[in-house]
């Protein structure tokens, strides 16, 4: 699938400072032969969560049955948004990451390598800033990982609110939960398999249960775009739960698919204000809910 081309771009990026390995060259060669491949790459569980490194590719969601239309959209958007995918390999400057960890009073090795499918430092700073400013009682997150770790630490420092995070991969959710607990922080991470989306939205969506009735901060960092470029738009189904004055943070907001989502959100939710911060590797959409 398009993952092969993304992986080839990753190999080209990662080998700028060193000679390309034989496996890398083979990936680059094979990527040109086929756009559709039923076996996208995945990382091991240890690679996904260790502080030293994480896998570049997200876990395999392709056991889902994608419609012909969804497959076409993924291929079409993949053809135009590869520059954003390539740019996203950069998780941010090492200094920015070090500054973030120092601000949270965490050791330099507390976070894994960032970038690719993971949050970059700019998005993580937005999470910390929102929590410090709002002191939210309830944070809800879609897609767990480094962002959950940072949000849990920020809540520990600023206000002591709660975070509930949903992720489609049960084992990854459990591993992330252990990672956070091992660092003496608090977060509730739940498995939410992907299934039918809310009416009016394409792709597949989290099958959510026991969602908090009121949300102060909604963090949207999943599902991955390879399910459908507009898949994260279904997060709007949670907007009625956001309290007046509450906020939304959407990761990867500079990508073409997320820009379409943002336009629709602005049109359909007049009581909310959305602003794009294009800084960082991937961009962040900042949402604010007015009182009426």
What do the PLM-derived regions correspond to, one by one?
Residues 17, 49-105, 110-111:
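Membrane-proximal basic amphipathic "stem/tether" segments
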Residues 104-133:
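Class I SAM-dependent methyltransferase Rossmann-like catalytic core
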Residues 162-167:
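Conserved SAM-binding motif I beta-strand of class I
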Residues 177-212:
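S-adenosyl-L-methionine
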Residues 224-292:
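C-terminal substrate-binding/active-site "lid" region of AdoMet-derived donor-dependent transferases
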């Amino acid at each position: 699938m398009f993952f092969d081309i993304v992986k080839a771009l990753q190999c080209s990026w990662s080998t700028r400072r060193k000679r390309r390995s034989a496996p890398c060259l083979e990936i680059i060669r094979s990527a040109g032969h086929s756009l559709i491949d039923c076996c996208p790459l995945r990382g091991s569980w240890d690679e996904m969560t260790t502080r030293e490194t994480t896998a570049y590719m997200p876990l395999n969601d392709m056991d889902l049955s994608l419609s012909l239309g969804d497959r076409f959209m993924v291929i079409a958007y993949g053809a135009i948004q590869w520059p954003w995918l390539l740019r996203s390999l950069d998780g941010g400057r090492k200094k920015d990451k070090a500054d973030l960890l120092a601000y949270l009073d965490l050791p330099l090795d507390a976070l894994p390598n960032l970038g690719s499918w993971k949050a970059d430092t700019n998005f993580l700073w937005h999470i910390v800033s929102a929590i410090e400013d709002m002191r939210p009682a309830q944070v809800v997150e879609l897609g767990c990982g480094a962002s959950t770790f940072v949000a849990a630490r920020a809540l520990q420092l600023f206000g002591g609110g709660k975070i509930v995070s949903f992720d489609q991969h049960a084992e990854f959710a459990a591993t992330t939960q252990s990672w956070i607990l091992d660092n003496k922080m608090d977060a509730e991470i739940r498995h939410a398999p992907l299934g039918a989306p809310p009416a009016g939205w394409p792709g597949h969506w989290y099958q959510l249960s026991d969602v908090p009735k009121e949300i102060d901060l909604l963090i949207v960092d999943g599902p991955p775009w390879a399910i459908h470029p507009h898949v994260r738009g279904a997060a709007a189904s949670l907007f009625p739960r956001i309290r007046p004055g509450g906020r939304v943070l959407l990761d990867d907001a500079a990508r073409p698919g997320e820009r379409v989502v943002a336009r629709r959100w602005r049109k359909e939710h007049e009581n909310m204000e959305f602003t794009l911060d294009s800084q960082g590797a991937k961009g962040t959409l900042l949402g604010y809910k007015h009182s009426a």
